[in-house]
Amino acid sequence: MLDYLRDAAEIYRRSFAVIRAEADLARFPADVARVVVRLIHTCGQVDVAEHVAYTDDVVARAGAALAAGAPVLCDSSMVAAGITTSRLPADNQIVSLVADPRATELAARRQTTRSAAGVELCAERLPGAVLAIGNAPTALFRLLELVDEGAPPPAAVLGGPVGFVGSAQAKEELIERPRGMSYLVVRGRRGGSAMAAAAVNAIASDRE
């Protein structure tokens, strides 16, 4: 029999201990540091900490929104699948409309992506919601456009889209002009569905 650690709780404990020992978390307040640890745990890269941009109130604001029952709006089915429902404090609805037939029709009409169309279809649910965006820069760009057009902003944007085209630019637009939204995103090309879901999971419950 191979010799390896089998206890899930101990694997988690040791993993988080290694992350806290190796990552530079000094610039983060304690609540944000806990989220960053989760992001690192998801991707295995401690230098992610160097690229996290955030507003000081993001954990408190997103946490309060979730506690009040706000929905979690996701840009992809993968983000939605990664959110641990048992961690959500108020049986919060997890919404992803990327696979909705209406998104396909709207995307064709707008000549954009289904992810962007899915965000637009969620416009009425935006006020006070938590947005988990990990896949599509176009989804974040469309969110920013909707707020510019008068839609009430969500409480927070978490994660950040991954990619080589538009990803860094969409996040920088959010950072430079937050439009009343709190945020925690990974700058540059990195991001992804797993990171977006991890950010929600970390904020949804104090359990590490």
UniProtKB/Swiss-Prot annotation:
Query: Which catalysed reactions does the entry list for this protein?
Result: precorrin-8X + 3 H(+) = hydrogenobyrinate
| Gene Ontology molecular functions | precorrin-8X methylmutase activity
Q: Which UniProt keywords apply?
A: Cobalamin biosynthesis, Isomerase
Domain of life of the native organism: Bacteria
Give the enzyme's EC designation: 5.4.99.61
Q: Which GO terms describe its biological process?
A: cobalamin biosynthetic process
Report the active site residues: H41 (proton donor/acceptor)
Its pathway, per UniProt, is: Cofactor biosynthesis; adenosylcobalamin biosynthesis; cob(II)yrinate a,c-diamide from precorrin-2 (aerobic route): step 8/10
Q: What does this protein do?
A: Catalyzes the conversion of precorrin-8X to hydrogenobyrinate.
> Of which family is this protein a member?
Belongs to the CobH/CbiC family.
Q: What is this protein called?
A: Precorrin-8X methylmutase
